[in-house]
């Protein structure tokens, strides 16, 4: 975990881009129907990954913005309601912080993605925003949860451990 402001910024950038890359690969694969083919996501191609990486360049910035403005603070506040660092296991508190941050970030980023990809770039009517957002959230939440818990957060902690040692 970061011990000062500089480390916190680096941690935030790595975590934001780890999440953006994973979620963009997932969403691009779904958009291109990869999950519907026999074998599902094992049919992923470098073309899908390349397109996702291009989108992740700017979506990572959106993740940083949302997490800095309200995602991290609200997630920490929610976690503090169920976890007391003085009494509870530190690992439990870390998991609660991650889970509560996902509870805030996934709906926020799903809304941002709906506005960017469905409304602005896709031309969907604004009155469809609530329905499209709900569908996007339902699609993204399981992936965001498991990607964060088992890939992005462990990778970020490992990378920061190596960078800050």
What do the predicted segments below correspond to?
Residues 1-165:
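Juxtamembrane/disordered regions of integral membrane proteins
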């Amino acid at each position: 975990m970061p011990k000062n402001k500089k480390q916190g910024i680096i941690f935030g950038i790595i975590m934001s881009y780890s999440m953006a890359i994973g979620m963009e690969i997932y969403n691009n694969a779904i958009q291109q129907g990869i999950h519907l083919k026999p074998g599902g996501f094992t049919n992923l191609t470098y073309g899908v990954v390349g397109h996702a990486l291009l989108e992740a360049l700017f979506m990572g910035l959106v993740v940083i913005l949302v997490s800095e403005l309200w995602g991290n603070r609200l997630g920490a506040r929610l976690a503090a309601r169920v976890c007391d660092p003085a009494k509870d296991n530190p690992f439990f508190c870390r998991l609660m912080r991650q889970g509560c941050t996902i509870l805030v970030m996934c709906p926020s980023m799903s809304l941002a993605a709906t506005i960017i990809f469905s409304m602005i770039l896709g031309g969907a009517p604004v009155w469809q925003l609530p329905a499209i957002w709900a569908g996007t959230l339902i699609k993204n939440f399981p992936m965001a949860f498991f990607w964060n818990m088992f890939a992005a957060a462990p990778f970020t902690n490992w990378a920061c451990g190596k960078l800050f040692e």
